[in-house]
């Protein structure tokens, strides 16, 4: 069974950041520690944990840019469970939290290989974004809750 919640223990936080590093940073030769951003304590975090194995299989965070705009960052899903709904669980959790806070819009910078996923859950591309590590194209995407519901 998959459970979505915020990390609570030191061990969960360690696993949370390890998954983020393994999926988003290590494949491009980035240093360990680069997966932890300066404003982590000011963001909301979500993880998906497999209750049978106690393995964290997905992580994501959302920062509040303005009282009505949130920004999702650092979404990482373990390769062996990609395509099985983990990303959707993470996004639903953060979107529900955003709506509880009165946030009307979520923006994100999607890696090119994730654009199709975000389109499938109601996000739209509104402009191209940056090129990470000189090779990973990102696209600015958003979901307007007023328009989506």
Where are these regions (language model features)?
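Anionic, Ser/Thr-rich low-complexity intrinsically disordered regions
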Residues: 1-121, 126-145, 149
């Amino acid at each position: 069974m998959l459970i979505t919640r915020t990390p609570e223990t030191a061990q969960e936080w360690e696993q949370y950041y390890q998954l983020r590093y393994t999926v988003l940073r290590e494949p491009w030769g980035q240093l360990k520690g680069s997966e932890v951003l300066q404003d982590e304590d000011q963001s909301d975090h979500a993880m998906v944990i497999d209750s049978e194995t106690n393995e964290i299989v997905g992580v994501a965070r959302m920062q509040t840019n303005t009282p009505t705009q949130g920004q999702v960052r650092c979404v990482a899903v373990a390769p062996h469970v990609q395509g099985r709904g983990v990303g959707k669980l993470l996004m639903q959790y953060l979107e529900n939290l955003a709506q509880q806070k009165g946030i009307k819009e979520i923006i994100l910078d999607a890696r090119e290989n994730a654009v199709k996923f975000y389109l499938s859950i109601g996000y739209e591309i509104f402009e191209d974004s940056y090129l990470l590590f000189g090779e990973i194209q990102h696209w600015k995407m958003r979901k307007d809750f007023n328009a989506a519901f």
